[in-house]
């Protein structure tokens, strides 16, 4: 007899339907798995055999052949344990068949418990597309999978529980989609940050237009503190963004029963010792940091300390919003549209340009330190802002700045203007094409005159001109202005005149 169980698999961060076909035949007892299984799938034979026996059931004394179709796609992970076991029990007459529009996923323990798997939400979305209406998943994945529409998700704790449900004796209660809690949406507040009003304003502009930022300042000036509060002023994620980000985190095993859905915008701050593979994506086609930060913020502290090859792999995601990972296991394309926020000291010791003569670096040493900055990466940074050390009086003063919520309301209004402006493709001012800029970056006569003066006086390049115009458009959006006025140009130019950086590299000078 042949039993067919509908299941699901993962490739990259996308799911696809898999059919587990189980055939019991005569001959010497043997358990064969075919269909390009990896080592984890092959080990399912021992987990399934032990689970059947420890649940008080009989493992067939016959030849068991399991085919995971389509047979030309590699199968990985432990997600097929439960469908294989259920197919064997159905084929041997020890379990009732599943409905034709039902699918099963889950890892087994040796005692018959059903353990969580990675990628529950992407597989649930794939189940929807495949016309599946009932999905049996590990209880630890149920709330995550239930976020998919038009799908009844049954949380399964143990094999006997599933068998009793299929027999109609005691039904499993379907899982409910997770509701957001206040704790999930809490962020550190900018009201807690003393001083640095100019930097807060620069980060507000960056958040409103999706611009990449570089903060330069001495140790202890608050660069990391300011960066960590940036997600709190970004707009809430849409349902589509939530599904994308949750899917990526789920494939990496970063979701759990307590936090099944990612509702906060991601904030990733990888250490400067990470490898290029960890940044872009690993050997097993796992998403890297640029994808884990999708729809959120990627914070690189001590930017010059990162290996150059690590910084270079960010060029494609910053340009295209996706990253292509090619490894021996195959090729995968992951979404990776994020805000890049970088921080660095002005020199190796950190005290260049500070009063008191604390810096011991030579000018040659400072230039060499700045030359570590990747030219193509700096090309994609719109806002560069100095973060000065706080004076004693500022440290003693009680924080009296605006709250993140107040700033966020202005950011939301500016983002809504951009959403209405760009019908498709472009999602923020930072991603404007030359055609978009021609259409939407109109300057007042006074604004045009100031832009011309700044261009000649500062020796700006064409690239700097484009960056200034994009940032000025965002500043105008925050002000509710249709055209770009002189005050918008003046503020945008301020974010490009960074005399506190010295470098022999032409890419990091205006």
Indicate where each model-derived feature is located:
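Short secondary-structure boundary/capping segments
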Residues: 10, 94-96, 145, 182, ...
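Basic, amphipathic alpha-helical bundle interface domains used for macromolecular binding and assembly
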Residues: 34-45, 58-60, 67-77, 284-285, ...
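Conserved ASCE/P-loop NTPase catalytic core
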Residues: 201-369
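Conserved, well-folded catalytic cores of nucleic-acid-processing
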Residues: 23, 39, 47, 51-58, ...
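Short coil/turn segments at secondary-structure boundaries
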Residues: 100-101, 176-179, 255-262, 423-432, ...
């Amino acid at each position: 007899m042949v039993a067919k169980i509908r299941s699901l698999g993962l490739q990259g961060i996308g799911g696809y339907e898999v059919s587990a076909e189980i055939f019991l035949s005569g001959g010497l007892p043997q358990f064969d798995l075919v269909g390009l299984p990896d080592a984890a799938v092959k080990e399912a034979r021992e987990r399934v055999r032990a689970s059947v026996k420890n649940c008080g059931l009989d493992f067939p004394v016959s030849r068991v052949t399991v085919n995971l179709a389509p047979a030309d796609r590699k199968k990985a992970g432990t997600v097929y344990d439960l469908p294989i076991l259920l197919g064997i029990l159905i084929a041997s007459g020890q379990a009732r068949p599943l409905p034709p529009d039902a699918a099963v996923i889950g890892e087994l323990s040796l005692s018959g418990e059903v353990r969580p798997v990675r990628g529950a939400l992407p597989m649930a979305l794939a189940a929807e597309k495949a016309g599946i209406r009932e999905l049996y998943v590990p209880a630890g994945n149920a709330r995550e999978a239930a976020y998919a529409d038009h799908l009844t998700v049954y949380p399964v704790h143990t094999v006997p529980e599933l068998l009793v449900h299929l027999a109609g004796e005691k039904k499993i209660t379907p899982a409910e989609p997770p509701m957001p809690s206040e704790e999930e949406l809490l962020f550190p507040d900018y009201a807690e940050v003393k001083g640095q009003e100019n930097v807060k304003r620069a980060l507000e502009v960056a958040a409103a237009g999706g611009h990449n930022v570089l903060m330069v300042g001495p140790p202890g000036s608050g660069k990391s503190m300011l960066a960590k509060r940036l997600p709190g002023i970004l707009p809430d994620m849409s349902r589509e963004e939530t599904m994308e980000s949750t899917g990526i985190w789920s494939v990496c095993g970063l979701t759990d029963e307590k936090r099944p859905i990612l509702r906060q915008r991601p904030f990733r701050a990888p250490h400067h010792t990470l490898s290029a593979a960890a940044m872009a994506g690993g050997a097993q086609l796992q998403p890297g940091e640029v994808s884990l930060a999708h729809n959120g913020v990627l914070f690189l502290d001590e930017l010059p300390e990162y290996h150059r090859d690590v910084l270079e792999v960010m060029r494609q995601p910053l340009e295209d919003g996706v990253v292509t990972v090619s490894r021996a296991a195959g090729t995968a394309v992951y979404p990776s549209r994020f805000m890049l926020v970088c921080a660095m000291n002005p020199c190796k010791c950190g005290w260049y340009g500070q009063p008191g003569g604390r810096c011991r670096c030579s000018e040659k040493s400072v230039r060499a330190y700045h030359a570590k900055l990747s030219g193509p990466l700096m090309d994609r940074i719109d806002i560069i802002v100095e973060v000065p050390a706080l004076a004693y009086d500022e440290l003693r003063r009680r924080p009296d700045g605006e709250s993140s919520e107040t700033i966020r309301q202005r950011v939301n209004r500016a983002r809504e203007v951009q959403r209405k402006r760009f019908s498709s493709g472009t999602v923020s001012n930072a991603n404007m094409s030359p055609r978009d800029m021609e259409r939407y970056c109109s300057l007042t006569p006074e604004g045009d005159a100031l832009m011309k003066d700044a261009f000649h006086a500062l020796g700006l390049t064409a690239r700097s001109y484009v960056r200034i115009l994009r940032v000025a458009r965002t500043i105008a959006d925050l002000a509710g202005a249709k055209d770009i006025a002189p005050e918008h140009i003046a503020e945008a130019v301020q974010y490009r005149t960074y005399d506190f950086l010295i470098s022999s590299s032409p890419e990091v000078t205006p």
